[in-house]
Structures are given as C-alpha cells and as structure tokens.
Swiss-Prot record:
A Pfam family assignment: IspA
Membrane topology recorded in Swiss-Prot or TrEMBL: Multi-pass membrane protein
Keyword list, A-Z: Cell inner membrane, Cell membrane, Membrane, Transmembrane, Transmembrane helix
Function: Plays a role in cell envelope biogenesis, maintenance of cell envelope integrity and membrane homeostasis.
Transmembrane segments: 27-47, 53-73, 76-96, 118-138, 149-169
GO cellular component: plasma membrane
Species whose genome carries this gene: Haemophilus influenzae (strain 86-028NP)
Gene: yciB
Localization terms from the record: Cell inner membrane
Family that this chain belongs to: Belongs to the YciB family.
Protein's UniProt name: Inner membrane-spanning protein YciB
Length: 185
C-alpha cells in the first residue's frame, strides 16, 4: 500500500495533464501529494525524510507551475532533485567516507565495503543520468514528451537501476543459506 501511494500523485498528474493541461495537472499533483503525506502520517505514524523533501519540492515547484501556467518549473524540480541526490551520495562517500546507501540498507544487507562504495557510486551515476536525460528532453522535445518521460521514463529507468543493483548485490549474498557477517563470497 505504501509503495502504491507513491505513484498516485504521479498517475493523477499524468491523467489530468492529458485531459486538462499544465495548470490543472500541477494543482492536482500538489493536492494529491499533500494528501499522500497526510495519509502516510495517519496510517503509518511517520513520514520518511526523503518523502518530506520530495513532497516539499513537489508543492513548491507545482505551485509555481500552477501560478505561472508554465511546466518548466516542474521540469526544474526533476533536474534539481536528481542533482541533489547525486551530490548527497557523492559527498557522503568522498567527504565523509560513508556510502549513504549503506546507511539506508546496511541493516538488511551485509556487504563488503567495496560493494557499498560501488552501489553508492552506481546510484549517484543513475541520478546524474536522470538529471541529464531530463534536461535533454525538457529542452529538445515537446511538453507532452516530457510529461510522458516524467510519468513513465523515470520509473522505467529506476526499475532498471534497481534490477542492476539487485544483480550486483546477489553475488555477495551467502550461497549456503548462512548469514555471513562480512558479506564475502
């Protein structure tokens, strides 16, 4: 249910854009995102930091989009958020010597430090690619093409990145069913 809630604002944005236009879609996106946060808080008692950041960005850029009736503000959101995620992952790894992916998944997975570093860099690269593809599409293709990319392309890219991460992690999982503490093969 929690994962489904993440997609509802995006689906409603896409449908409203196709039926109404930019302003209407932005308003629906903002309202649906606020409702999503309220439901998460009510049902689960907590809203994760990443969800708060994303919701704040959606509300801010969505309201700008609705007010000016100009989609470029939502296009900026995608670029800025992906860029920030990449920067945070890279700064955590190189400045603080802590792969952030390990902080997020370290309780569930036991992997060698090299694997955590590779995963962290892989996801930073993914966010950079998403940012660059978003810039390219928003500047060189139609508004409708960008909405399609935002609604489906980024999801597809995320699924592919998740599968690649899963395949990479799998090679470090214990093969005999034991719980190896160091995650070595």
């Amino acid at each position: 249910m929690k994962q489904l809630l993440d997609f509802i604002p995006l689906i409603l944005f896409f449908i409203t854009y196709k039926l109404g236009g930019v302003r209407e879609a932005a308003i629906v996106l903002v309202v649906a995102t606020i409702l999503q946060i309220v439901i998460l808080k009510w049902k689960y008692g907590i809203v994760e930091k990443q969800q708060k950041i994303m919701a704040s960005a959606v509300v801010f850029f969505g309201l700008l989009t609705a007010y000016f009736n100009e989609i470029r503000y939502l296009q900026w959101k995608v670029t800025i958020i992906n860029g920030l995620f990449a920067i945070v992952l890279l700064v955590a790894q190189f400045q603080f010597k802590t792969p952030l992916i390990k902080k997020l998944l370290g309780k569930e997975l036991q992997l060698p430090e090299k694997a955590w570093n590779t995963l962290n860099l892989g996801w930073a690269l993914f966010f950079i690619i998403c940012m660059l593809v978003n810039i390219y599409i928003s500047h060189n293709m139609s508004e409708e093409a960008w909405v399609d990319f935002k609604s489906f392309g980024i999801i597809g890219m995320t699924v592919i990145a998740t599968i690649i991460s899963g395949v990479y992690i799998y090679r470090y999982l214990p093969k005999d069913g034991s719980n190896s503490k160091d995650g070595e093969k």
